[in-house]
């Protein structure tokens, strides 16, 4: 089958070794594998001429997500499914669905400006972030009213999320099909560039991952977990993450994509 990866330009601008290895393995399975960055092309979307049987959405840009929506609308297969990616990328819909799935997650509010969240500080610190952000972009820890009144927020809706105290590290949970890994990384805006260290995945985390996989309809995804004194809290879900720090994830990623491509 023809499989095309919709990629993003990384920083630094070098291909992901994990994605490259997954592509190589898919080729050995008999697939014809290509990949390109949607922002580098002039893409007609009212009439599509597909060049692949399955598109793998690796990029999280708005352009790539919209193009995946156009592909989906024409009945062209996308992995992960477009609707699942759209739900995960929008923190409003993701948070609501996690509550429905009984996945522990912080209280969350949708706001139009930072100043609308002032009253929330009466009960403690909050996190402000874009409603469609990823990789920690635009995330702010707010502890005082002055931070909100002086904050220069990006255009568009924002999320105010109750701050969850933790050990100073995020637990990054990565999933490919039924396989679950966990990696601990320091919590800061550059954490996505670090590999972190692989750690044991306990049964509670496995159960959370299984609920998200089933409820969202995702096959390749990650979630950010804060290990709070009251138990784990999921603060974000991302489709097709980087899998940095996972022990040899490429074969499992390739096998998952192969299974989706073959419809099994």
Task: Name each model feature, range by range.
Residues 1-84:
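ATP-binding N-terminal substructure of ATP-dependent carboxylate-amine bond-forming enzymes
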Residues 44, 63-66, 114-118, 167-170:
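Short, well-ordered alpha-helical microsegments
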Residues 52-56, 173-175, 231-243:
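A short beta-strand motif that forms the metal-chelation/ATP-contact edge
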């Amino acid at each position: 089958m023809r499989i095309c990866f919709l990629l993003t330009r990384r920083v630094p601008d070098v291909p992901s070794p994990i994605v490259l290895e997954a592509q190589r393995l898919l080729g050995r399975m008999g697939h014809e594998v290509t990949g390109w960055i949607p922002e580098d092309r002039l893409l007609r979307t009212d009439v599509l001429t597909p060049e692949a049987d399955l598109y793998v959405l690796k990029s999280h840009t708005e352009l790539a997500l919209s193009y995946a929506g156009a592909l989906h609308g024409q009945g062209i297969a996308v992995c992960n499914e477009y609707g699942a990616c759209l739900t995960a990328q929008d923190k409003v819909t993701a948070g609501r669905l996690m509550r429905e799935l009984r996945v522990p997650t912080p209280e969350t509010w949708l706001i139009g400006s930072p100043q609308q969240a002032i009253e929330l500080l009466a009960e403690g610190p909050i996190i402000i972030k874009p409603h469609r952000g990823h990789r920690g972009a635009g995330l702010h820890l707010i502890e005082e009213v002055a931070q909100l009144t002086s904050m220069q927020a990006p255009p568009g809706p924002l999320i105010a999320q109750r701050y969850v105290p933790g050990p100073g590290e995020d637990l990054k949970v990565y999933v490919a099909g039924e396989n679950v890994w966990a990696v601990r990384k320091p919590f800061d805006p550059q954490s996505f560039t670090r590999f972190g260290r692989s750690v044991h995945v306990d049964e509670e985390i496995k159960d959370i991952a299984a609920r998200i996989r089933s409820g969202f309809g995702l096959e390749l995804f990650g979630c950010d977990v804060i290990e709070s004194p009251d138990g784990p809290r999921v603060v974000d879900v991302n489709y097709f993450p980087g899998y940095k720090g996972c022990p040899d994830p490429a074969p499992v990623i390739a096998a998952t994509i192969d299974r989706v491509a073959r419809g099994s």
